Amino acid sequence: MGSYKQLAVDGRQVKMLFSPRQAQLLLLGIMLLIAVGMLLGIKVYLMLAAALLLTAICTRWRGKSWQKIGVAVGKGLYRSRHVVLILALISILIGLWKQNGTLATLIYYGFAFIRPEVFLVMVFVLSSLVSMLLGTAVGTASTIGIVLMGLAQSMGMPGGVVAGAIVAGAFVGDRSAPTSGPLHLIATTTGVRSEELLRYVFSTLIPTYLLSLGFFYLLGLLYRPEAVDPGTIRGFQELLAGHYPVALYLLLPTLLLLALAVCRLEIIPNLLFTLTATFICSLYGGFSPAAIFQSALWGYSPAADLPFAAVLSGGGLLSFRAILLVVMAAMSLTSLLEDTGVIHQAMASVLDHIHTVPQLILATSLFSILGVAVAFTQTVAIVVPGTVLQSTYQRLEVDRLVLGRTIADTGVAASGIVPWSSAAMSPALVLGVPVLEFVPYAAYCWLSPLVTNIFGLLGWVKRNRLPLDKGREGEAAR
């Protein structure tokens, strides 16, 4: 098909099979394919697989052998193994926490902190605490979120305001928790250690969280329930304690998870220790090994007529299979696009105009949010900028931890307020509130991009320590 120029990309020579125009058209076609599929209700992983097939056919047409295409796809699958294992362990952990009463206990004692004068603040705090344990915004909205919405409705609080506080808190953990799938995908994509990224994202989390607390305190002055009926809260607690295990010892695995994270233990050993502690708690609580295994694999399913059945069901390895397939398909697609130079060719004209740190942070933010807006999913918003911008961060001598943090602050945190994204629509469906009604009140979601760009303007970024090629050598293995 002709001769192609070789360019150094991320410390290696890559043959550019496509012209910049062809590369842009291919990426546009991939985005449109995914967008149309989402609108038609087709599963994301199927559309990513179709995009992978389209890219493979175009690559073969440009002269690359099927064997080399397979090698490139295999590299992507290999790179995804770390985050896939983490997500698998998290899915098992959530299933067991729902079965043995850990989540019910957390909700039970969480109600003790409800105060009418700071109701919205407490909704945000409780939601964020649960999300820091579950690591998923949808899971948080589906558990504590439903309960808090029911309590708020009994007090006549506006649904959009309360849903905004719930969603804001839910995305704290979706972005920052040790059990967060998106966070580990960011680490894998950018080639940094999950433990280092977990610590580094707190540099913007803390000011954003404090600003969000201030926002909900002020908002609570406008939307304040006259009183919280103690009987209503006691009723919720009695329903929980009457039908599910509630005991303080069940919180020990959650404390262990957080303590090991603070002690800088790597996430996989951390999850394995936490799973072991959870297994022991389940046995102590009277669950048989067979029942524990069933919840670990298929998730927990209480009887449909029990109160909170919809709240405390789910989890399990098989419930995460679609997410695992999305990650593997996205990493394989990105690997093939990298190997053919498509991403570099398509974005080179933009990347060449980035000369300062503020421009770099802004470009990362826009690329990441655009990924959510076009592909409706966090995965594309993480993988594409996490791959495309690494060489630009290297050129400006900015550490890849900053790249990971910026993606977390934008493609993950802000995805909750992109009205047509799955990250926003799922909590909306669970809570029964339209996305546009809670967007103005989901303060954390729209403050995160602002804070991370302010950090960029002020030059508060970590400078590069390692050459890019050396840093990537063991990215997934670590």
Task: Name every feature range the model reports, one short phrase each.
Residues 26-38, 50-60, 87-95, 126-131, ...:
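Hydrophobic core segments of alpha-helical transmembrane domains in multi-pass membrane transport
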Residues 66-153, 305-391:
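Membrane-embedded alpha-helical segments and adjacent helix-loop junctions characteristic
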